[in-house]
Amino acid sequence: LSGPAITGDKTSIKLNAQYTGTTAQTVGQRIYIWEGTGRGQYAIVDTFNEVTKVATVKKEFDNTPGWQHLLGGFPIADPLDPSTKYFIEPRGSFSEPTYSSASASLPIAGDYYVGTHGRIGSSNITVLLGNGRGSRTTDGVNFTACSGVSTATWNDIEANANKFISVSSSGVVNSSNDGATWSDISGSVGSDTFTGVAAIGQTWIIVSDTGVIYRSTDNGSSWTNAQVEPYDGSTPIFKFVAAGNGLFITANQYGQTWESVDDGVTWQLAANVGLGVGGPKYIAKDLVFKNGKFLMPVQDSPLDDSTSLNKIFVTNANVAQSSTSAVTVWTESDTLPHSGPYKVTGMQGTFVAITANGETAYSYDGISWKQLTGTLSGTYDKIV
């Protein structure tokens, strides 16, 4: 059944007067907005009043009130209006797969601070790095020791189709073509307090505390740099960087973001026109690009008098959109099942987040989250 809506909001929709379905026929069905305001939103009909034609809706993911979006990261429209066209259709349901975790032994004992995965040739390779140590796996179970890893305080690591690069706060940069054998390429990059690294194709970007951004267009062989933001000698500038959808985004600790739509040649202060993502009540904890989305976990800011729950902000920003708009829209997640703050990763349409204490949660859109059973032992800095 389909038709235009009369009105609606974030938890309900008023169907048109011609809708003749009964409460029994309507409740439990899926409703999908295919055109107009709210396009892409979907939900389960939770209640329906046959007289007023008002249906309340709940999310398929966790049965809480509200809509989800097929492309998670887009804001939910409020209000809906007569341009809103909907389908009501039967809803199939399936049991979610069971979740389990297992420990893996690493060949070199010690703390590991950064990690990433990449597809190099025909192999899926995951690499973990610590101070002077590294471990590599192609199956997540069996790890072998890396060689040549420098003694450094690693801040970030990234992979493209044929290379890994890791950066440190001590100015050391390492690279590897296979994740197993590493070499120091600091001499070709320069010396700085490096905080993040990202890549699109053969173009690599390294960001620093000092406001300098380093760029390579030949897969890390040679580098140029530019002072993108002024540095006062003490206040860190860039803390994170991520890349995807043709877009590079870097951020400072307050969640202010800068975007580049031309492979890192130029940068523009973007999110909220100078305010941090989520506003002054949050500070940023990370920035990643996974499953086609940028995600920024945030923490309640000690600089703001209010107390805010730790969240994750999500955007589907891409190079075409950012080329025509100076403001990137970030959508605030629902409340996560633990106090956080979180680090987050994603693969094959699923996001997984972890706290420092090993509490885990998962999501299919980065907005709605459920708790995974049990708490992992240990202390966690990153999830890959």
Write out the residue ranges for each language-model feature.
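Conserved Ser/Thr-centered positions that define the repeating blades of beta-propeller domains
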Residues: 136-137, 175-176, 216-217, 260-261, ...
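Entry beta-strands of beta-propeller and related beta-repeat scaffolds
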Residues: 122-128, 162-166, 203-206, 246-250, ...
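Beta-strand initiation motifs
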Residues: 94-101, 141-144, 180-183, 220-224, ...
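Short glycine/acidic-enriched loop and turn motifs that connect beta-strands
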Residues: 134, 172-173, 212-213, 255-256, ...
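Autoprocessing Asn-cyclization modules and mimics
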Residues: 1-77, 81-82, 87-94
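Repeated scaffold domains used in trafficking and secretory/extracellular systems
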Residues: 109-119, 152-160, 192-200, 234-244, ...
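An edge-strand/N-cap motif at the start of beta-rich repeat modules
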Residues: 93-140
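Surface loop/turn motifs at the tips and blade-to-blade linkers of beta-strand repeat domains
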Residues: 104-108, 147-150, 186-190, 228-232, ...
